[in-house]
């Protein structure tokens, strides 16, 4: 696994650089406009380019339910579906699913669609496969985001499941016939506001060997 981030400048602990993906590069720090269903509301692809956007964040939960991953895939992935020729990142859908109070076990999360009431189950393997079909330049592994405030026992369970799912999601990504040639996959660190669990989660996620890493489970109820 080669490094995809290249540091170009630092200042008092902050740093700027470039991230390289199979589909192109973007500079950091980077603001990613949100295109929940692939497109950013009220803005055309040209508008986004004129504003200097480099990466658009799309939502796996919504895209897999409407219009459906098959539609996006058959249109050539997110680039063909939206017309946006810049880079894109898809989340795993986990945050939206966990807001629906799903039935969660070690296998995955079962939830009811907010569109038609149908029942679905998303697993780490399924999330990796769906995002491979959506074709974003960066996909995120499925994780467990515990709402805050939460007891240490609940956060511990989230960390353990996140770590186990990270291993499974990474294997599914690496086993996919061509995902590695088209995408990067990022792991997600959990742990709530518990420093020890955050540290443990970071270490366990690093050991899996993702292309990049995200800090998950923030801005969901913590006081600061």
What are the language-model segments listed below?
Residues 172, 176, 180-224:
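Glycine-rich phosphate/ribose-binding loops and adjacent secondary-structure elements
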Residues 1-178:
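Non-catalytic, usually N-terminal nucleic-acid engagement modules in DNA/RNA processing proteins
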């Amino acid at each position: 696994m080669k490094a995809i981030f290249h540091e170009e400048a630092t200042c008092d602990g902050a740093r700027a650089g470039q991230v390289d993906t199979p589909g192109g590069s973007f500079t950091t720090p980077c603001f990613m406009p949100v295109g929940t269903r692939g497109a950013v509301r009220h803005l055309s692809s040209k508008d986004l380019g004129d504003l200097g956007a480099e990466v658009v964040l799309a939502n796996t939960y919504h895209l897999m339910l409407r219009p459906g991953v098959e539609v996006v895939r058959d249109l050539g992935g997110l680039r063909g579906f939206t017309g946006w020729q810049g880079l894109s990142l898809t989340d795993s859908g986990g945050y939206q699913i966990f807001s629906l109070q799903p039935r969660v076990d070690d296998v995955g999360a079962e939830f009811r669609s907010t569109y038609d009431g149908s029942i679905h189950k998303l697993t780490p393997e399924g999330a990796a496969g769906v995002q491979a079909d959506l074709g974003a330049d960066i996909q995120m592994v499925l994780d467990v985001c515990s709402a805050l405030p939460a007891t240490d026992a609940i956060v511990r369970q989230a960390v353990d499941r996140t770590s186990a799912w990270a291993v499974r999601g990474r294997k599914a990504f690496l086993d996919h016939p061509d995902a590695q040639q088209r995408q990067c996959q990022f792991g997600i660190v959990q742990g709530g506001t518990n420093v020890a669990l955050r540290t443990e989660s970071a270490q366990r996620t690093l050991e899996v060997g993702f292309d990049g890493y995200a800090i998950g489970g923030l801005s969901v109820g913590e006081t600061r």
